[in-house]
Amino acid sequence: VRDYISGMVILGEDQYRVGELVKINGYEGYVEEVGLRLTKLRDFDGSLHIIQNGNISVVTNQARHPMMVKTEIYVDKTLDPERVNMALERALERINGEGYKKEVVTKFINQGICNMTDFDAVYSLYGFVKPETQWRMDRIIREIAIEELLKDGLVRERTLGERS
C-alpha cells in the first residue's frame, strides 16, 4: 500500500518523468519507467535499478534546472599566473560567446588558483549550463583552455614518471 501511495504522490507532484536524469536514494540514471508501485532507472553502465516507490526518500532531478560545470585546469606552477589568467580569460570569452549561447545559462568565470600540487597550480573555471550538457561543456572548456594556453606557450611536456 505504501508503494502505491508514494507512486501517486510522485506522479501527482510530477517529481520526475520518463527520460529525465535523476538520483534516487543514491542511484543515478535515466528514468525508464514510473509506475504506481515501482520506478526503474537505467544507470550509465547499463544497470537497471528497480526501486519500490515506498522506499524512495531522496530524489534529485538533474533534468529541470541549470547544472554547474566546474572545470579545473592544471598548469605548471612556475608559470606567471597573470599570463595564465589572461589565456584562460580568452578561453572563457570564446565559451561565453555566440558559439555556445544555447548551452551556457550563466557566463563562465575564472576563480583563479584554487589549489596547488607538487608541480601544478590548479585554476578553477565555473558556470551554469542547460541540463545534460554539463559533460560536453566540461570537455569543450578543457579543449579551448588548452588551445589558448598553447598559443602563449604555457603548456609544457611532462617527463616520464612525473606526476601532477
Spans of model-derived segments:
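Alpha-helical transmembrane segments
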Residues: 1-2, 127
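Soluble accessory domains appended to multi-pass membrane transport proteins
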Residues: 9-102
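Short helix-terminus and kink motifs of transmembrane alpha helices
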Residues: 2-7, 16-17, 139
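Solvent-exposed, non-transmembrane regulatory segments of membrane-associated proteins
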Residues: 79, 99-164
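Positions in alpha-helical segments
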Residues: 3, 69-70, 123
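A broad detector of the eukaryotic-type serine/threonine protein kinase catalytic domain
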Residues: 6-9, 130
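Basic side chains
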Residues: 2, 37-40, 142
